[in-house]
Amino acid sequence: MQKKGKNNMQKPTLGNPQKTIEVLQKYGFSFQKKFGQNFLIDTHVLDKIIASANITKEDMVLEIGPGIGTMTQYLACAAGKVVAVEIDKALIPILEDTLSAYDNVTVINEDVLKVDINQLAQEYNQGKPIKVVANLPYYITTPIIMGLYESHVPIESITVMVQKEVADRMQTGPGSKDYGALSLAVQYYASPYIVANVPPNCFMPRPNVGSAVIRLTSHKEPPVQVEDEQLMFKIIRASFNQRRKTLANGLNNSPEIQLPKEVITEAIESLGKGASIRGEALTLEEFAKLSNIISKTL
């Protein structure tokens, strides 16, 4: 569904509790738990998101889950073009109302995981890199972010509100309890930076967890050289599926890595690591080296 509006660009009218309640009551909207809906009601947080995303009138921004259009209004004022993908059809009439003054916004009523984002980038931005800005549903954060990266959408940066714990996992390094497959995957594609921590009272309804704004600035080239990207991620997943096991046992027990145990052990030892090393101790560079060694034996 295309959203066309007037030519004037008014300042955002949403972003506080009173206005949010007014809009929700006007349309008799009920929050859907299955969609993980928590709307932002703090203008300071909204300003911080827009500033950290470094949006200009040259940019096309993809917003995932615009809700009632609060952040969409801020994005429309800053960007050249905004494409907002909203799964909840009950929000579409609200968005038509709250975004009626912004003629640079297109709203698509669809599940973002089923949308061809590459096609959107081509259609609305001539295939040039886009910026993604969103207050993401927490239950589906990882599939959305990894889906964007793994489908090789041209992305300059992703600036998103996520669960604090997930933000910590994205930016942490080896040896941390938060370090895992998500840390390595994100850091392979981008440089993560936590912009701000956001308390529950900045949302309606309040989530039960703390939140954080994180900016992922895409690498122009991967920071490591890897011969088989898919194999590296299979090794990474296998290494963290059973964290208490040694790296050798984790890889040996994985249905994705079907190699004799002695081959796996030799590959790990060729990194200069002992047999008792665990996956959580390896850096992205070491996982890339391990993958390259193993790929030669396949």
Feature names for model-found ranges:
Residues 1-238, 269, 280, 289, ...:
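Catalytic cores of RNA-modifying enzymes
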Residues 218, 237-298:
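C-terminal lobe and adjacent flexible extensions of AdoMet/dcAdoMet transferase-like proteins
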